[in-house]
């Protein structure tokens, strides 16, 4: 059974003076899902989060949570919690007191507070650390405290404002796994904001990409990466080698090289001219091929898990990402490119 829309924004416009930050935006988040707003700085994603939270009021439009119009309600009246980039913990309080703070504001019985705080600390792997203070734990542990403080209130909606930006790479990877696991375990409807593509892909059911206050594309991480709908999306979602070519109904033709079309790539595409994108990992090098596939290796860089290789093909430089087993060529050596049909995408030629 399809889940219902739990958070809905209708015709939202937000202006600061004469500056329109969000213009006529519609957004839906299904119950129990995690949706990420992704985009460059200044695209409006944080403003949308603040509108949902009640920290900003829309210039026009409506916001619904669980079927109720909350447009005019304060943050305290919306049954939501936020996890901030800065953690926003009280340094003069113990970890236990930080997590318990919201429950005490609700004037719950002390025994219920104790049970819920102990459970929340256990959930985020901080069991037995309640008496410590903020300056006695790591950045990753501080973010876990902030997460526990939000979870303990059992909110209808959980909001994340770039929560991992202050952590190093290893901690970010660990924390995004924790966030995703807990969000799924408790089935909490969540809205997440980040500028980091890898982070968005790792935690999200759905990603919404924004640019200058507008939604550019909505989809699963796989859909956005494999089937971008514009040149902006093609470049924003990762490296892409772009060509002019055409599709004849059976094959995709680029510089005389004919690639058998994959149905998932060409579905609903009429015959004609296109801008054709090929992701770096969708190109391999072979020692044999046709004249139209011949290329010259210009440079390579060892990146640990892979090589980044630049080749010259028909007067155009291409970026390839090859694992060590795939790359055993020498520089300046001639080779032949092979495109994986599933790694292509087609954009309108006139764009």
Swiss-Prot record:
GO terms for molecular function: ABC-type ferric iron transporter activity; ATP binding; ATP hydrolysis activity; transmembrane transporter activity. Part of the ABC transporter complex FbpABC involved in Fe(3+) ions import. Responsible for energy coupling to the transport system. The gene is fbpC. Residues 7-237 form the ABC transporter domain. This is Fe(3+) ions import ATP-binding protein FbpC. The keyword Nucleotide-binding applies. SUPFAM superfamilies: MOP-like, P-loop containing nucleoside triphosphate hydrolases. Its main location: membrane. It comes from Vibrio cholerae serotype O1 (strain ATCC 39315 / El Tor Inaba N16961).
């Amino acid at each position: 059974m399809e889940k219902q829309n739990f958070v809905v924004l209708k015709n939202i416009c937000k202006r600061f003076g004469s500056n329109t930050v969000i213009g006529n935006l519609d957004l839906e988040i299904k119950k129990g899902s995690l949706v990420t707003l992704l985009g460059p700085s200044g695209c409006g994603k944080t403003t949308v989060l603040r509108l949902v939270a009640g920290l900003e009021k829309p210039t026009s439009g409506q916001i619904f949570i669980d079927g109720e119009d909350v447009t005019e309600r304060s943050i305290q009246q919306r049954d939501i919690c936020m996890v901030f980039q800065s953690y926003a913990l009280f340094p003069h309080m113990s970890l236990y007191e930080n997590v318990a703070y919201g429950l005490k504001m609700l004037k719950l019985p002390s025994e219920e507070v104790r049970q819920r705080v102990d459970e929340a600390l256990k959930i985020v792997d901080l069991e037995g650390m309640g008496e410590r203070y903020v300056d006695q734990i790591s950045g990753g542990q501080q973010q876990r405290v902030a997460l526990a403080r939000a979870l303990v209130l059992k909110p209808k909606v959980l909001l994340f404002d770039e929560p991992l930006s202050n952590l190093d790479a290893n901690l970010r990877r660990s924390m995004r796994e924790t966030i995703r696991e807990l969000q799924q375990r408790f089935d909490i409807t969540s809205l997440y904001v980040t500028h980091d593509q890898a982070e968005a892909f790792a935690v999200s059911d759905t990603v919404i990409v924004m640019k200058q206050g507008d939604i550019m594309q909505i989809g699963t991480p796989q859909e956005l990466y494999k089937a971008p709908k514009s040149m902006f999306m093609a470049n924003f979602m990762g490296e892409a080698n772009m060509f002019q070519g055409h599709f004849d109904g059976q094959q995709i033709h680029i510089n005389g090289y004919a690639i058998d079309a994959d149905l998932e790539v060409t579905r609903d595409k009429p015959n004609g001219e296109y801008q054709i994108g090929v992701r770096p990992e969708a190109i391999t090098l072979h020692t044999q091929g046709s004249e139209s596939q011949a290329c010259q290796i210009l440079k390579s860089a060892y990146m640990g898990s892979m090589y980044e290789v630049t080749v010259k093909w028909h007067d155009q430089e291409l970026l390839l990402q090859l694992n060590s087993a795939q790359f055993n060529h020498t520089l300046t050596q001639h080779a032949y490119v092979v495109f994986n049909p599933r790694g292509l995408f087609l954009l309108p030629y006139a764009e």
